[in-house]
Every structure is written in structure tokens, then in C-alpha cells.
Design a protein with these regions (language model features):
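Conserved nucleotide-binding/hydrolysis micro-motifs of P-loop NTPases
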Residues: 1-2, 72-75, 95-102, 152-154
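Conserved nucleotide-sensing/catalytic segment adjacent to the nucleotide-binding pocket
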Residues: 4-65
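N-terminal regions of ATP-driven nucleic-acid and macromolecular assemblies
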Residues: 12, 23-28, 121, 128-132, ...
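Substrate-engagement module of ASCE P-loop NTPases
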Residues: 51-63, 120, 124-131, 135
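Loop/turn-to-beta-strand initiation segments
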Residues: 61-68, 88-90
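Short, surface-exposed basic-aromatic patches at helix termini and helix-loop junctions that form
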Residues: 79-87, 161-165
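A glycine- and Lys/Arg-enriched "phosphate-lid" helix/loop adjacent to the NTP-binding pocket
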Residues: 85-133
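NTP-dependent small-molecule kinase module
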Residues: 133-177
Length: 177
């Protein structure tokens, strides 16, 4: 979306999710740091959700499989899916609940991907932590599967188990085997 929409039209779209607040109107400068971070994220997610919903609706219409992932895929997106569909929707959120572990993961990511500098994330760590805390609370309220991503192998196993259980439950409900 960033390549299609000029920064002058939607400046919050051209920021990272954890600092989209910097593009919010000036009257929000007086909000607390944590509220600004969350408000900026939600403004940005509102914009991204338009495209995500279009992709989702097209996949439903064309009956194709779709994996939609990212920090902007909020629990509310599920409400945009008609109940008159055969779609199997599995919502999962990953979280790292240990601050030191998340910092280590940022450092490791920067070693494996030259374009993802750890310092950028570490400098904004408090905002990232606040945002993750808020997203995990939203997920808990929406009764989504929350998978702790402290260990890659364990997280992958839990994701696969969650998918498998959801497929099994769907098949039992629809009488398929």
C-alpha cells in the first residue's frame, strides 16, 4: 500500500506500526506515550484493513486458500466474514512475554536479515512492548489462540497443533472425516 499511496495523503501508513503515532494530528500530542502508540497503530491498521478485507473477500468469492498475516490483522477482521461461508478461519497471535527474549530476537533478526537493523527496534522497544501488550489483551478478549514465541520449534509445533485442532473441529461439525 505504501507504494500506491503518497506519504502526503496518508503519512501514518509510511511509518512502522510502533511509531505511526508520529503522523497523527498534532492535537493528540498531549496523550500519554502508550495511548499515542496504540492510537497510531489503530489508525494505521484501519487503513491497512481496507486492503486486507478486499483480499479476504476475494479469496472467499473465488474459494481459494489464503494465509493473511501481519501485525495489522486484528481480531475485528473476522467480523467481516459472512457466516454463510465454508471458510475455515484460524486466528492466531504470536507473542513474546519476556522482554529480554524479545530484545534477543530483534538482535538475531538483524543478523539474519541485513535490512532489519536491531538498533531501530531496540530504540523503540518500549513502544513495541506497549503495542504487543495491547494486541495480546485484544486477542485474549476475542478468545484467540495466543502462542508464546520464545522458542521457534515450540511455537511452530503449537501453531500446527492449533491448525490441526481447528480442522478437526470443523470436520466434526460438518460431518466430514
Amino acid at each position: 500500500m505504501r507504494t500506491m499511496v503518497a506519504v502526503q495523503l496518508m503519512p501514518e501508513l509510511h511509518e512502522s506500526s510502533f511509531n505511526a503515532w508520529k503522523a497523527l494530528p498534532k492535537h493528540q500530542e498531549h496523550a500519554s506515550g502508550s495511548k499515542r502508540v496504540i492510537d497510531g497503530y489503530h489508525r494505521q491498521a484501519d487503513l491497512v484493513e481496507v486492503a486486507a478485507e478486499a483480499v479476504l473477500q476475494r479469496a472467499l468469492r473465488e474459494n481459494v486458500s489464503l494465509l493473511l498475516e501481519g501485525v495489522h490483522v486484528r481480531p475485528s477482521l473476522i467480523n467481516k466474514i459472512s457466516h454463510n461461508t465454508n471458510a475455515i478461519v484460524i486466528q492466531i497471535i504470536l507473542g513474546v512475554t519476556n522482554k529480554k527474549q524479545l530484545q534477543r530476537q530483534f538482535q538475531g533478526r538483524s543478523k539474519s536479515s541485513q535490512n532489519r537493523r536491531a538498533d531501530r527496534y531496540l530504540e523503540s522497544f518500549d513502544a513495541i512492548w506497549e503495542l504487543q501488550t495491547s494486541l495480546l489483551a485484544e486477542a485474549k478478549t476475542a478468545n484467540l489462540s495466543i502462542i508464546i514465541n520464545d522458542n521457534l520449534i515450540d511455537a511452530l509445533a503449537m501453531i500446527m497443533r492449533s491448525i490441526s485442532n481447528s480442522l478437526r473441529d470443523h470436520n466434526l461439525k460438518t460431518g466430514q472425516s
